[in-house]
Curated annotation (Swiss-Prot):
Converts heme B (protoheme IX) to heme O by substitution of the vinyl group on carbon 2 of heme B porphyrin ring with a hydroxyethyl farnesyl side group. It catalyses: heme b + (2E,6E)-farnesyl diphosphate + H2O = Fe(II)-heme o + diphosphate. GO terms for biological process: heme O biosynthetic process. This is Protoheme IX farnesyltransferase. It is a multi-pass membrane protein. It is an enzyme of class 2 (transferase). InterPro entries: Protohaem_IX_farnesylTrfase, UbiA_prenyltransferase, UbiA_prenylTrfase_CS, UbiA_sf. GO terms for molecular function: protoheme IX farnesyltransferase activity. Keywords: Cell inner membrane, Cell membrane, Heme biosynthesis, Membrane, Transferase, Transmembrane, Transmembrane helix. It is found in: Cell inner membrane.
Length: 318
């Protein structure tokens, strides 16, 4: 019995497709999407109007490549514990679909392409910041903090807060206060987001001896910390509008409503810190929170946004 030519062709194509999918999964694309949304917010806030399409596309691609490189290196370092944790054991490296040397070559290629593209199409500051983000995430967070400190996310969150700086720098060639406020927003958003996840999979982290906060101090104390960071996040988001004046009433209203809802959900979690459904709900909302907040920045920066902001400001009772 022999295979037809169509069958012989189909099997190699399926293998290639499976391998491409494995590399795609290695980069953690859902995380990249969220990082690129904050990059776009940084660009929009810096431009305060229409963006050069070529610059915008190049910056997003370059930022995406940098994030993919960082995530791949993270997967390389964590492949031993990923093989044990229920949530991660089927990732490409622990499952054997990609070999470590292949992942190394892939990650370094992505990092090099990111730097070259950002340096060519944007500027050296944007390229340098993206590279610094990779180094910070891999060396400081993944190697230095993740397995050794319960504050790993608090300090390591700075790596995830670099993309809006890259976006701002790509447009202006420098950094200013609004960019640093965006940086602070993402830094303060990170602990509630990841600690909510840690509450959901606390046993997994305990099994591999990763000292996430719920493992070290328990669920109740973690929920209180989530509430504290949510409380700090609200005035920080509003600082973009006042006193900096970098965002308008539409953003302000969105930030206020989102911040109050995050506080409400965090308070609910404090009342039932062992509730995984509440932790899951908070985790999912935190993703939508950051997406909508960045979307509000973009809306305020679009052509015609001043008239929209004026209409909102004139609304009775605003």
């Amino acid at each position: 019995m022999t295979l037809s030519s169509d069958s012989r062709l189909r099997f190699p194509l399926e293998e290639v497709g499976a391998q491409l999918l494995a590399y795609w999964q290695l980069t953690k694309p859902r995380i990249i999407l969220l990082l690129l949304i904050t990059t776009a917010a940084g660009m929009g806030l810096a431009a305060q109007g229409p963006l050069d399409p070529r610059l915008a596309i190049a910056t997003l691609i370059g930022g995406g490549l940098a994030a993919a490189a960082a995530n791949t290196l993270n997967c390389l370092y964590d492949r031993d514990i990923d093989a044990i944790m229920e949530r991660t054991r089927w990732r490409p490296l622990p499952s054997g679909r990609i070999q470590p040397f292949e992942a190394w070559a892939f990650a370094l290629s992505l990092a090099a392409l990111s730097f070259i593209l950002l340096d060519w199409q944007a500027n050296q500051l944007a390229a340098g910041l993206a590279l610094a983000g990779i180094v910070f995430y891999v060396v400081i967070y993944t190697h230095g903090l993740k397995r050794h400190s319960s504050q790993n996310i608090v300090i390591g969150g700075a790596a995830g807060a670099i993309p809006p700086l890259v976006g701002w720098a790509a447009v202006t060639g420098e950094l200013a206060w609004p960019a640093w406020i965006l940086f602070a927003i993402v830094c303060l958003w990170t602990p509630p987001h990841f600690w909510a996840l840690a509450l959901m999979i606390r046993d997994d982290y305990a099994a591999v001896k990763v000292p996430m906060l719920p493992v070290v101090v328990g669920n109740a104390a973690t929920a209180q910390q989530i509430l504290a960071y949510a409380g700090l996040l609200l005035p920080t988001t509003l600082a973009l509008a006042w006193p900096l004046g970098a965002a308008g009433p539409f953003y302000s209203a969105t930030a206020l409503l989102l911040g109050l809802e995050l506080l409400r959900r965090s308070r609910q979690l404090c009342q039932a810190p062992d509730s995984r459904p509440l932790a899951r709900s908070l985790f999912k909302f935190s993703i939508f929170y950051l997406m909508l907040l960045c979307g509000a920045i973009a809306m305020d920066c679009l052509p015609g946004a001043p008239s929209l902001s004026q209409a909102i400001a004139a609304w009775p009772g605003f």
